[in-house]
Amino acid sequence: VFNPKLLNKPIVVLSNNDGCIITRSTEAKALGIKMGEPYFKVKNVIKKNNVKVFSSNYALYGDMSQRVMEILLGFSPDVEIYSIDEAFLSLKGFKNYELLTYCKHIRKTIKQWAGIPVSIGVGSTKTLSKIANHLAKKNNAYEGVCILKKKEKINEALQETEIEDVWG
């Protein structure tokens, strides 16, 4: 968010005392760097691939999270903050087309106001919403928003999802 030069570059963030990898960019994931992996075990991969390494800054993450959550509250009065980077919104009453347009607007607003790219997954349950979000992140065809409402689409999404990737 604060350094556009890092866009599309491999990046990792380390835990307290810089012991383990706590988050990685898509580019760092593609290098095989795993979540929770001890930093010393991947130091060579990091050096070889010019991966940018940052110490964690929880105060900053909390502030950015609060900004995003406040934006979400402007789109739905029913927001359940699940974690520092996840929330569930009730979007009852939307038709499919309106829902897609609304979700794209939410996504665009968060990017414009907070500078953070987000993916949005919509489903009738939290688990289906999480699966939809996973698909929205991984498949560019969704353009960051995946809605699992129709039975065929839900079945297709479930068949594509490994059981160990299912939340809950």
Task: Give the label of every model feature segment.
Residues V1-I84, F88:
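Residues that scaffold, gate, or flank divalent-cation-dependent active/transport sites
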Residues A30, L99, A136-N139:
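Short, hinge-like loop/turn segments at secondary-structure boundaries
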Residues V51-K52, P77-Y82, L99, K111-I120:
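Short secondary-structure capping/junction motifs at helix and strand boundaries
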Residues R67, I71-F75, H105-A114:
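Generic non-transmembrane alpha-helical segments
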Residues D85, I120, Q159-G168:
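Helix-hairpin-helix
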Residues L89-R107:
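Catalytic palm subdomain of template-directed nucleic-acid polymerases
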Residues G115-H134:
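Structured, non-catalytic alpha/beta "coupling" segments that mediate domain-domain communication
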Residues N140-I163:
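A short, charged helix-loop
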